[in-house]
Regions:
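A composition-driven surface/loop motif
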Residues: 1-28, 32-232
Length: 232
């Protein structure tokens, strides 16, 4: 029986450069090249792996099919979640590959994931403060939303550096349903902060998903580039 493997990301290499790995053996770890953000992708079974990459010591863990995603929440790897989700106000839903923000925050999300293994949602009725700091997310599965507010959520969203979010089919890039409210601006002290948002097929850039009305969206500052998907 073939052993099931899962994707794990390892950042910190020269963009577009070759990466030589010493281990883990037997899992297609030759001819590895970092992407444009200096990230490599390894496909491995569940377990903990220690190896070197371009002479650098690395350790990663894949547990229950979930490995490092390259995205952090308040400096913690999103996939592993906080030690105490209740007090931290967030957790990672491994089934839907979604960071669920259920507290007031503030939350800062950073990193790069373009393989659809990280989305973000603010849960129903929560008032929260969220900052995107050089965050790039691409939703790849039909119905995946890069950043969604659930019903009656109220969010103050700040962006620092350059962030770029793209949702998949039938979802808005940043989904704000009827009854939810989103206020957007650049982070204090970052006058050049920029956010790019793209909806999937049938979805708005910011607002409602397929054939759905949107809630209240207020833009207070910063550079914001928004595009709906085809027929959105």
């Amino acid at each position: 029986t073939a052993e099931q493997v899962f994707c794990a990301t390892v950042p910190g290499f020269s963009p577009g450069g070759p990466v030589v790995l010493d281990g883990p053996a037997g899992y297609g770890t030759t001819d590895i090249v970092a992407d444009e953000h200096g990230i490599i992708y390894l496909w491995l079974p569940n377990g903990t792996y220690t190896f070197t990459a371009n002479g650098r010591d690395c350790t990663l863990t894949i547990q229950d099919g979930v490995g490092p995603t390259g995205v952090t929440v308040n400096d913690e790897e999103a996939a592993y979640g906080p030690a105490d989700p209740l007090s931290a106000g967030w957790r990672f839903d491994t089934t839907n590959r979604t960071v669920l923000l259920s507290g007031q925050g503030p939350f800062t999300l950073s990193g790069y994931n373009v393989i659809g293994t990280v989305c973000i949602a603010v849960t129903n009725g929560v008032t929260s403060t969220v900052t995107f700091s050089n965050l790039t997310l691409r939703a790849t599965g039909s119905g995946q939303c890069a950043f969604a507010l659930e019903t009656n959520a109220v969010v103050s969203l700040y962006f620092a550096g350059e962030s770029d979010l793209t949702s998949a089919k039938y979802r808005a890039g940043v989904e704000v349903p009827t009854g939810a409210s989103l206020a957007i601006t650049n982070a204090p002290g970052d006058d050049v902060g920029a956010l790019t948002v793209t909806g999937g097929y049938g979805g708005a850039g910011i607002g409602g998903g397929y054939d759905a009305n949107g809630g209240v969206v207020t833009v207070n500052g910063g550079t914001l580039t928004v595009a709906g998907g085809f027929a959105g």
